[in-house]
Amino acid sequence: MNSWFRRAATQGRSCNLGIPQASDGPILRASRCVLAGTFLVLCLNAVPVGAQSLEEEVRAMRIELRRLQQEVGTLKEELRRRTAPAESAGSGSQGSQEKSAAAQEPAAAEVLPLLQAQVAEHAQVKVESNSRLPLKIFGTIVSNTFWNSGEANWLDVPNIVAPSPDAPVPKGSFSSTMRQSRFGVIVDGPAIGSLKSSGFLALDFFGGIPNFQTGQVMGIPRLLYAFARVEGEHTAVEIGQDQMILAPRNPTSLAAMAFPDLYRSGNLYLRVPQARVEQRIAAGDLDEFQLTGGILAPIAGDFAANSLVFVPPNLAGERSRRPAAQGRVAWRRRFSYGSEDRLEIGVSGHYGRERPVMGPRRSWAGAVDLDARAGRLGIGGEWFAGRNIDAFGGSLGQVAKSTGGFLEGRLAATRRLELNAGVGIDRLFDFDLFPAPLRQNRSVFANTIFQITPELAASFEYRWLMTTPARGEMRRNNHLNLALAFSF
Protein backbone atom coordinates (compact mmCIF):
# COMPACT_ATOMS: atom_id res chain seq x y z
CA MET A 1 0.00 0.00 0.00
CA ASN A 2 2.67 2.51 0.98
CA SER A 3 4.95 1.63 -1.95
CA TRP A 4 2.03 1.96 -4.30
CA PHE A 5 1.15 5.29 -2.81
CA ARG A 6 4.71 6.53 -3.24
CA ARG A 7 4.69 5.54 -6.90
CA ALA A 8 1.34 7.22 -7.46
CA ALA A 9 2.35 10.36 -5.64
CA THR A 10 5.49 10.79 -7.77
CA GLN A 11 3.48 10.81 -11.01
CA GLY A 12 2.52 14.43 -10.48
CA ARG A 13 -0.41 15.83 -12.42
CA SER A 14 -0.69 12.77 -14.65
CA CYS A 15 -2.12 10.68 -11.80
CA ASN A 16 -5.18 8.62 -12.77
CA LEU A 17 -7.52 6.75 -10.42
CA GLY A 18 -10.03 5.54 -13.02
CA ILE A 19 -11.76 8.91 -13.37
CA PRO A 20 -12.68 9.90 -16.96
CA GLN A 21 -9.94 12.02 -18.50
CA ALA A 22 -10.52 15.05 -20.69
CA SER A 23 -8.46 17.82 -22.13
CA ASP A 24 -10.59 20.72 -21.00
CA GLY A 25 -7.87 22.83 -19.43
CA PRO A 26 -5.89 23.32 -16.22
CA ILE A 27 -8.91 23.72 -13.91
CA LEU A 28 -10.08 20.23 -14.76
CA ARG A 29 -6.59 18.83 -14.43
CA ALA A 30 -6.28 20.41 -10.99
CA SER A 31 -9.68 18.99 -10.08
CA ARG A 32 -8.59 15.51 -11.09
CA CYS A 33 -5.39 15.78 -9.07
CA VAL A 34 -7.22 17.09 -6.01
CA LEU A 35 -9.64 14.19 -6.39
CA ALA A 36 -6.72 11.78 -6.69
CA GLY A 37 -5.06 13.15 -3.58
CA THR A 38 -8.35 13.02 -1.67
CA PHE A 39 -8.83 9.41 -2.73
CA LEU A 40 -5.32 8.59 -1.50
CA VAL A 41 -6.06 10.17 1.87
CA LEU A 42 -9.24 8.09 2.09
CA CYS A 43 -7.28 4.94 1.25
CA LEU A 44 -4.70 5.82 3.87
CA ASN A 45 -7.32 6.38 6.54
CA ALA A 46 -8.89 2.99 5.88
CA VAL A 47 -7.06 1.09 8.63
CA PRO A 48 -9.10 -2.10 9.18
CA VAL A 49 -9.92 -3.30 12.66
CA GLY A 50 -11.79 -6.39 11.50
CA ALA A 51 -13.66 -7.86 8.55
CA GLN A 52 -16.85 -5.95 9.23
CA SER A 53 -14.90 -2.69 9.72
CA LEU A 54 -13.08 -3.25 6.43
CA GLU A 55 -16.36 -3.68 4.55
CA GLU A 56 -17.70 -0.50 6.09
CA GLU A 57 -14.54 1.38 5.10
CA VAL A 58 -14.75 0.14 1.49
CA ARG A 59 -18.44 1.00 1.31
CA ALA A 60 -17.76 4.49 2.67
CA MET A 61 -14.94 5.03 0.16
CA ARG A 62 -17.16 3.99 -2.73
CA ILE A 63 -19.85 6.43 -1.66
CA GLU A 64 -17.27 9.19 -1.28
CA LEU A 65 -15.77 8.34 -4.68
CA ARG A 66 -19.17 8.58 -6.38
CA ARG A 67 -19.77 11.93 -4.71
CA LEU A 68 -16.40 13.23 -5.89
CA GLN A 69 -17.04 11.97 -9.43
CA GLN A 70 -20.32 13.89 -9.44
CA GLU A 71 -18.46 17.00 -8.32
CA VAL A 72 -15.95 16.55 -11.14
CA GLY A 73 -18.81 16.21 -13.61
CA THR A 74 -20.28 19.43 -12.28
CA LEU A 75 -16.90 21.15 -12.68
CA LYS A 76 -16.62 19.89 -16.27
CA GLU A 77 -20.08 21.21 -17.10
CA GLU A 78 -19.25 24.54 -15.49
CA LEU A 79 -16.01 24.70 -17.45
CA ARG A 80 -17.82 24.00 -20.75
CA ARG A 81 -20.40 26.68 -19.98
CA ARG A 82 -17.73 29.28 -19.27
CA THR A 83 -15.52 28.45 -22.25
CA ALA A 84 -18.34 28.34 -24.85
CA PRO A 85 -18.63 32.16 -25.19
CA ALA A 86 -14.86 32.47 -25.29
CA GLU A 87 -14.57 30.04 -28.23
CA SER A 88 -17.06 32.10 -30.31
CA ALA A 89 -15.25 35.36 -29.59
CA GLY A 90 -12.37 34.61 -31.97
CA SER A 91 -8.63 34.51 -31.76
CA GLY A 92 -8.31 37.61 -29.56
CA SER A 93 -10.43 36.00 -26.93
CA GLN A 94 -8.47 32.79 -27.39
CA GLY A 95 -5.27 34.62 -26.58
CA SER A 96 -6.72 35.97 -23.36
CA GLN A 97 -7.95 32.49 -22.47
CA GLU A 98 -4.44 31.12 -22.93
CA LYS A 99 -3.13 33.82 -20.63
CA SER A 100 -5.77 32.92 -18.07
CA ALA A 101 -4.85 29.25 -18.35
CA ALA A 102 -1.19 30.13 -17.95
CA ALA A 103 -2.06 32.06 -14.80
CA GLN A 104 -4.02 29.10 -13.42
CA GLU A 105 -1.28 26.57 -14.22
CA PRO A 106 1.09 27.59 -11.39
CA ALA A 107 -1.81 27.42 -8.93
CA ALA A 108 -2.50 23.79 -9.85
CA ALA A 109 1.21 23.02 -9.79
CA GLU A 110 1.44 24.47 -6.29
CA VAL A 111 -1.63 22.67 -4.93
CA LEU A 112 -0.58 19.17 -5.98
CA PRO A 113 2.87 19.02 -4.29
CA LEU A 114 1.33 20.43 -1.11
CA LEU A 115 -1.37 17.76 -1.19
CA GLN A 116 1.23 15.06 -1.82
CA ALA A 117 3.33 16.27 1.12
CA GLN A 118 0.32 16.29 3.43
CA VAL A 119 -0.68 12.77 2.44
CA ALA A 120 2.91 11.55 2.87
CA GLU A 121 3.08 13.08 6.34
CA HIS A 122 -0.27 11.47 7.14
CA ALA A 123 1.19 8.09 6.16
CA GLN A 124 4.17 8.56 8.48
CA VAL A 125 2.42 9.65 11.68
CA LYS A 126 -1.17 8.42 11.43
CA VAL A 127 -2.24 6.27 14.37
CA GLU A 128 -5.91 5.79 15.03
CA SER A 129 -7.91 4.35 17.91
CA ASN A 130 -11.06 2.25 17.71
CA SER A 131 -13.11 5.36 18.46
CA ARG A 132 -11.26 7.38 15.78
CA LEU A 133 -9.70 9.68 18.37
CA PRO A 134 -6.19 10.96 17.54
CA LEU A 135 -3.65 8.67 19.21
CA LYS A 136 0.10 9.17 19.68
CA ILE A 137 2.43 6.35 20.66
CA PHE A 138 5.67 7.20 22.48
CA GLY A 139 8.41 5.28 24.22
CA THR A 140 11.99 5.23 25.45
CA ILE A 141 14.29 2.22 25.24
CA VAL A 142 16.65 2.57 28.22
CA SER A 143 19.82 0.55 28.80
CA ASN A 144 21.48 0.72 32.24
CA THR A 145 24.91 -0.79 32.84
CA PHE A 146 25.84 -0.42 36.53
CA TRP A 147 28.43 -1.23 39.20
CA ASN A 148 28.13 -1.17 43.01
CA SER A 149 30.96 -1.27 45.52
CA GLY A 150 28.69 -2.22 48.43
CA GLU A 151 25.43 -4.04 49.10
CA ALA A 152 22.69 -2.10 47.30
CA ASN A 153 19.06 -2.92 48.05
CA TRP A 154 18.13 -2.38 44.37
CA LEU A 155 21.13 -3.04 42.16
CA ASP A 156 20.22 -0.75 39.24
CA VAL A 157 18.54 2.05 41.24
CA PRO A 158 19.93 1.80 44.81
CA ASN A 159 18.49 3.90 47.64
CA ILE A 160 19.44 1.97 50.81
CA VAL A 161 22.74 0.27 51.66
CA ALA A 162 22.18 -3.22 53.07
CA PRO A 163 24.43 -5.02 55.58
CA SER A 164 27.55 -6.68 54.20
CA PRO A 165 27.15 -10.38 53.42
CA ASP A 166 28.79 -12.99 55.57
CA ALA A 167 32.18 -14.25 54.45
CA PRO A 168 33.24 -15.59 52.05
CA VAL A 169 30.56 -13.87 49.88
CA PRO A 170 32.15 -10.74 48.33
CA LYS A 171 30.52 -7.32 48.37
CA GLY A 172 29.48 -5.39 45.29
CA SER A 173 27.78 -6.14 41.98
CA PHE A 174 27.86 -5.51 38.23
CA SER A 175 25.23 -6.08 35.54
CA SER A 176 23.06 -4.49 32.87
CA THR A 177 19.29 -4.18 32.46
CA MET A 178 16.61 -2.77 30.17
CA ARG A 179 13.74 -2.79 32.65
CA GLN A 180 13.56 1.00 32.97
CA SER A 181 12.40 1.16 29.33
CA ARG A 182 8.91 2.57 29.00
CA PHE A 183 6.19 3.15 26.45
CA GLY A 184 2.74 4.68 26.36
CA VAL A 185 0.01 6.48 24.46
CA ILE A 186 -1.45 9.98 24.45
CA VAL A 187 -5.06 10.44 23.37
CA ASP A 188 -6.59 13.75 22.27
CA GLY A 189 -10.20 13.48 23.31
CA PRO A 190 -13.27 15.36 22.12
CA ALA A 191 -13.92 18.96 23.08
CA ILE A 192 -16.50 19.51 25.81
CA GLY A 193 -17.70 23.01 25.11
CA SER A 194 -14.62 25.19 25.60
CA LEU A 195 -12.77 22.42 27.47
CA LYS A 196 -10.19 20.05 26.01
CA SER A 197 -10.06 16.40 27.04
CA SER A 198 -7.08 14.06 26.88
CA GLY A 199 -5.79 10.76 28.17
CA PHE A 200 -2.33 9.50 29.11
CA LEU A 201 -1.01 5.98 29.73
CA ALA A 202 2.57 4.85 30.42
CA LEU A 203 4.19 1.58 31.51
CA ASP A 204 7.69 0.32 32.21
CA PHE A 205 9.16 -3.09 33.10
CA PHE A 206 10.10 -2.39 36.72
CA GLY A 207 7.29 -4.51 38.20
CA GLY A 208 9.65 -7.23 39.40
CA ILE A 209 11.10 -10.37 37.85
CA PRO A 210 9.74 -13.93 37.77
CA ASN A 211 11.11 -16.59 40.10
CA PHE A 212 13.07 -18.26 37.34
CA GLN A 213 16.69 -19.10 36.62
CA THR A 214 17.07 -16.23 34.13
CA GLY A 215 14.39 -13.98 35.58
CA GLN A 216 16.75 -10.99 35.51
CA VAL A 217 16.05 -10.51 31.80
CA MET A 218 12.26 -10.92 32.11
CA GLY A 219 11.13 -7.61 33.57
CA ILE A 220 7.42 -7.58 34.42
CA PRO A 221 5.38 -4.61 33.09
CA ARG A 222 4.35 -2.02 35.68
CA LEU A 223 1.68 0.67 35.44
CA LEU A 224 3.23 4.13 35.78
CA TYR A 225 0.58 6.64 34.71
CA ALA A 226 -3.02 6.25 33.60
CA PHE A 227 -5.29 9.28 33.79
CA ALA A 228 -7.94 11.25 31.95
CA ARG A 229 -7.85 15.04 32.02
CA VAL A 230 -10.27 17.83 31.14
CA GLU A 231 -8.89 21.36 31.12
CA GLY A 232 -9.80 24.87 30.16
CA GLU A 233 -7.85 28.09 30.10
CA HIS A 234 -7.45 28.30 33.88
CA THR A 235 -9.01 25.15 35.37
CA ALA A 236 -8.25 21.44 35.00
CA VAL A 237 -9.79 18.26 36.42
CA GLU A 238 -7.86 14.99 36.40
CA ILE A 239 -8.82 11.47 37.45
CA GLY A 240 -6.44 8.50 37.40
CA GLN A 241 -2.96 7.49 38.47
CA ASP A 242 -0.40 10.30 38.45
CA GLN A 243 2.38 11.60 40.66
CA MET A 244 1.05 12.72 44.01
CA ILE A 245 0.41 16.40 44.74
CA LEU A 246 2.75 16.54 47.74
CA ALA A 247 6.39 17.54 47.03
CA PRO A 248 6.34 17.29 43.20
CA ARG A 249 10.03 18.03 42.52
CA ASN A 250 12.49 15.33 41.37
CA PRO A 251 16.20 15.51 40.51
CA THR A 252 17.29 15.36 36.87
CA SER A 253 18.57 11.93 35.83
CA LEU A 254 18.52 9.60 32.86
CA ALA A 255 19.80 6.66 34.93
CA ALA A 256 17.01 6.86 37.54
CA MET A 257 13.70 6.84 35.69
CA ALA A 258 11.87 4.03 37.49
CA PHE A 259 12.43 5.74 40.86
CA PRO A 260 14.01 9.20 40.98
CA ASP A 261 17.41 10.02 42.44
CA LEU A 262 17.53 10.70 46.19
CA TYR A 263 14.42 8.60 46.81
CA ARG A 264 14.51 7.71 50.54
CA SER A 265 17.18 10.39 50.94
CA GLY A 266 14.97 13.46 51.15
CA ASN A 267 12.93 13.08 47.95
CA LEU A 268 9.30 12.07 48.52
CA TYR A 269 7.75 10.27 45.55
CA LEU A 270 4.69 8.16 44.72
CA ARG A 271 2.39 7.60 41.75
CA VAL A 272 -1.09 6.94 43.10
CA PRO A 273 -4.74 6.86 41.92
CA GLN A 274 -6.35 10.23 42.63
CA ALA A 275 -8.92 12.83 41.67
CA ARG A 276 -7.58 16.39 41.57
CA VAL A 277 -8.59 19.91 40.60
CA GLU A 278 -6.06 22.51 39.42
CA GLN A 279 -6.65 26.25 39.21
CA ARG A 280 -4.36 28.93 37.78
CA ILE A 281 -4.87 32.53 38.89
CA ALA A 282 -3.06 35.30 37.05
CA ALA A 283 -1.39 37.91 39.25
CA GLY A 284 -0.02 40.38 36.73
CA ASP A 285 1.55 39.91 33.34
CA LEU A 286 4.35 37.56 34.45
CA ASP A 287 3.07 36.09 37.72
CA GLU A 288 0.50 33.45 38.54
CA PHE A 289 -0.68 31.33 41.45
CA GLN A 290 -1.39 27.62 41.08
CA LEU A 291 -3.82 25.89 43.44
CA THR A 292 -4.08 22.09 43.44
CA GLY A 293 -6.19 19.87 45.67
CA GLY A 294 -7.39 16.30 45.58
CA ILE A 295 -8.14 13.01 47.24
CA LEU A 296 -5.88 9.98 46.85
CA ALA A 297 -6.04 6.24 47.37
CA PRO A 298 -4.85 5.44 50.95
CA ILE A 299 -1.55 3.70 50.19
CA ALA A 300 0.10 2.48 53.42
CA GLY A 301 1.48 -0.65 54.97
CA ASP A 302 4.29 -2.93 53.89
CA PHE A 303 3.40 -5.65 51.42
CA ALA A 304 5.21 -8.63 52.93
CA ALA A 305 4.48 -11.29 50.30
CA ASN A 306 7.50 -12.74 48.50
CA SER A 307 5.64 -13.58 45.29
CA LEU A 308 3.20 -11.93 42.93
CA VAL A 309 -0.47 -12.00 43.93
CA PHE A 310 -3.60 -11.68 41.82
CA VAL A 311 -5.46 -9.02 43.84
CA PRO A 312 -4.27 -6.14 46.06
CA PRO A 313 -4.19 -7.05 49.76
CA ASN A 314 -6.20 -5.27 52.44
CA LEU A 315 -3.44 -3.36 54.23
CA ALA A 316 -3.39 -0.52 56.75
CA GLY A 317 -4.37 2.11 54.18
CA GLU A 318 -7.32 0.23 52.74
CA ARG A 319 -8.57 -0.66 56.23
CA SER A 320 -8.88 3.04 57.07
CA ARG A 321 -11.93 3.12 54.73
CA ARG A 322 -11.26 6.72 53.71
CA PRO A 323 -9.09 8.53 51.13
CA ALA A 324 -6.05 10.63 51.88
CA ALA A 325 -6.09 14.36 51.08
CA GLN A 326 -3.32 16.49 49.58
CA GLY A 327 -3.04 20.09 48.46
CA ARG A 328 -0.49 22.54 47.11
CA VAL A 329 -0.25 26.31 46.64
CA ALA A 330 2.49 27.64 44.35
CA TRP A 331 3.63 31.01 43.06
CA ARG A 332 5.34 31.15 39.67
CA ARG A 333 7.07 34.08 38.03
CA ARG A 334 8.49 34.33 34.53
CA PHE A 335 11.34 36.78 34.21
CA SER A 336 10.37 37.91 30.69
CA TYR A 337 8.00 37.09 27.82
CA GLY A 338 9.06 34.16 25.66
CA SER A 339 11.85 33.17 28.07
CA GLU A 340 12.27 29.91 29.98
CA ASP A 341 13.77 31.77 32.94
CA ARG A 342 11.44 31.33 35.88
CA LEU A 343 11.03 31.01 39.63
CA GLU A 344 8.48 28.78 41.36
CA ILE A 345 7.96 28.24 45.08
CA GLY A 346 5.33 25.85 46.42
CA VAL A 347 3.92 24.72 49.76
CA SER A 348 2.11 21.37 49.98
CA GLY A 349 0.59 19.11 52.59
CA HIS A 350 -0.76 15.59 53.14
CA TYR A 351 -3.14 14.03 55.64
CA GLY A 352 -4.42 10.45 55.87
CA ARG A 353 -5.43 7.70 58.23
CA GLU A 354 -4.11 4.17 58.63
CA ARG A 355 -5.50 1.19 60.53
CA PRO A 356 -2.84 -1.48 61.12
CA VAL A 357 -3.29 -4.43 63.47
CA MET A 358 -2.16 -2.46 66.54
CA GLY A 359 -4.76 0.30 66.07
CA PRO A 360 -5.48 3.46 64.02
CA ARG A 361 -2.82 6.09 63.41
CA ARG A 362 -2.42 9.32 61.47
CA SER A 363 -0.24 10.01 58.45
CA TRP A 364 0.76 13.61 57.77
CA ALA A 365 3.42 15.64 55.99
CA GLY A 366 4.25 19.19 55.01
CA ALA A 367 6.70 20.23 52.30
CA VAL A 368 8.23 23.28 50.63
CA ASP A 369 9.57 22.99 47.07
CA LEU A 370 11.63 25.28 44.85
CA ASP A 371 12.49 25.41 41.16
CA ALA A 372 14.36 28.22 39.39
CA ARG A 373 16.17 28.82 36.14
CA ALA A 374 18.26 31.76 34.95
CA GLY A 375 20.06 31.40 31.65
CA ARG A 376 22.05 28.18 31.69
CA LEU A 377 21.81 27.72 35.44
CA GLY A 378 19.05 26.00 37.35
CA ILE A 379 18.29 24.96 40.91
CA GLY A 380 15.63 22.78 42.46
CA GLY A 381 14.80 21.04 45.70
CA GLU A 382 12.37 20.40 48.50
CA TRP A 383 12.22 20.06 52.30
CA PHE A 384 9.68 18.06 54.29
CA ALA A 385 8.66 16.86 57.73
CA GLY A 386 6.17 14.08 58.34
CA ARG A 387 4.99 11.00 60.17
CA ASN A 388 4.12 7.57 58.78
CA ILE A 389 4.98 8.52 55.20
CA ASP A 390 6.86 5.33 54.39
CA ALA A 391 4.76 4.85 51.22
CA PHE A 392 6.33 8.06 49.85
CA GLY A 393 9.89 6.99 50.68
CA GLY A 394 9.95 9.13 53.83
CA SER A 395 11.55 7.89 57.07
CA LEU A 396 13.67 5.55 54.91
CA GLY A 397 10.52 3.57 54.12
CA GLN A 398 9.76 2.98 57.81
CA VAL A 399 6.81 3.78 60.08
CA ALA A 400 8.33 6.69 61.99
CA LYS A 401 8.77 10.48 62.13
CA SER A 402 11.37 12.12 59.94
CA THR A 403 12.53 15.31 58.31
CA GLY A 404 14.67 15.74 55.24
CA GLY A 405 15.07 17.19 51.80
CA PHE A 406 17.32 17.59 48.80
CA LEU A 407 18.97 20.31 46.73
CA GLU A 408 19.96 20.04 43.08
CA GLY A 409 22.04 22.27 40.79
CA ARG A 410 21.80 22.21 36.98
CA LEU A 411 24.05 23.59 34.25
CA ALA A 412 23.24 23.57 30.53
CA ALA A 413 26.85 23.63 29.32
CA THR A 414 25.85 23.53 25.65
CA ARG A 415 22.67 22.89 23.71
CA ARG A 416 23.43 19.16 23.91
CA LEU A 417 25.34 18.74 27.17
CA GLU A 418 23.94 19.27 30.66
CA LEU A 419 25.51 18.71 34.07
CA ASN A 420 23.51 17.93 37.21
CA ALA A 421 24.44 17.30 40.84
CA GLY A 422 22.58 17.10 44.12
CA VAL A 423 22.57 16.00 47.74
CA GLY A 424 19.79 14.67 49.96
CA ILE A 425 19.19 13.49 53.51
CA ASP A 426 16.40 11.81 55.48
CA ARG A 427 16.75 11.76 59.28
CA LEU A 428 14.39 10.29 61.88
CA PHE A 429 13.38 12.34 64.94
CA ASP A 430 11.55 11.38 68.15
CA PHE A 431 13.52 8.19 67.80
CA ASP A 432 12.81 7.12 71.39
CA LEU A 433 9.04 7.27 70.83
CA PHE A 434 9.17 5.91 67.27
CA PRO A 435 12.12 3.50 67.04
CA ALA A 436 13.10 1.93 63.72
CA PRO A 437 15.93 -0.24 62.37
CA LEU A 438 17.44 2.62 60.32
CA ARG A 439 18.15 6.09 61.68
CA GLN A 440 19.47 8.15 58.74
CA ASN A 441 20.17 8.03 55.01
CA ARG A 442 22.40 10.35 52.93
CA SER A 443 23.00 10.41 49.19
CA VAL A 444 25.02 12.45 46.70
CA PHE A 445 24.75 12.20 42.92
CA ALA A 446 26.32 13.79 39.86
CA ASN A 447 25.63 13.08 36.20
CA THR A 448 26.21 14.27 32.68
CA ILE A 449 23.56 13.95 29.97
CA PHE A 450 24.57 14.31 26.32
CA GLN A 451 21.91 14.58 23.62
CA ILE A 452 23.54 12.81 20.66
CA THR A 453 20.48 13.33 18.44
CA PRO A 454 16.94 14.45 19.28
CA GLU A 455 16.10 10.76 19.74
CA LEU A 456 19.32 9.36 21.26
CA ALA A 457 20.88 10.40 24.59
CA ALA A 458 23.69 9.07 26.78
CA SER A 459 24.41 9.65 30.45
CA PHE A 460 27.03 8.73 33.03
CA GLU A 461 26.07 8.99 36.69
CA TYR A 462 27.84 8.55 40.02
CA ARG A 463 26.02 8.04 43.31
CA TRP A 464 27.33 7.83 46.86
CA LEU A 465 25.04 6.44 49.55
CA MET A 466 25.49 6.12 53.30
CA THR A 467 22.90 4.42 55.53
CA THR A 468 23.12 4.70 59.32
CA PRO A 469 21.41 1.88 61.25
CA ALA A 470 20.09 2.22 64.79
CA ARG A 471 22.85 -0.13 65.91
CA GLY A 472 26.04 -1.10 64.17
CA GLU A 473 28.38 0.50 61.68
CA MET A 474 27.47 2.90 58.89
CA ARG A 475 27.07 1.29 55.48
CA ARG A 476 28.43 2.87 52.29
CA ASN A 477 28.01 2.21 48.59
CA ASN A 478 29.48 3.76 45.44
CA HIS A 479 27.28 3.36 42.38
CA LEU A 480 28.27 3.94 38.73
CA ASN A 481 25.68 3.87 35.97
CA LEU A 482 26.01 4.23 32.19
CA ALA A 483 22.63 4.90 30.59
CA LEU A 484 21.65 5.00 26.92
CA ALA A 485 18.15 6.08 25.91
CA PHE A 486 16.47 5.99 22.51
CA SER A 487 13.13 7.80 22.35
CA PHE A 488 10.47 7.42 19.69
Language model features with spans:
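Outer membrane beta-barrel
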Residues: 112, 123-302, 321-326, 330-334, ...
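N-terminal periplasmic/intermembrane-space "pro-region" immediately following the signal or transit peptide
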Residues: 51-154
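N-terminal secretory signal peptides that target proteins for export/translocation
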Residues: 1-31
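Detector for outer-membrane/organellar transmembrane beta-barrel domains
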Residues: 327, 332, 338-438
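Outer-membrane beta-barrel "beta-signal"
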Residues: 450, 475-488
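Sequence/structural signature of outer-membrane beta-barrel proteins
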Residues: 148, 190, 206-212, 242-248, ...
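Bacterial N-terminal signal peptides
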Residues: 33-45
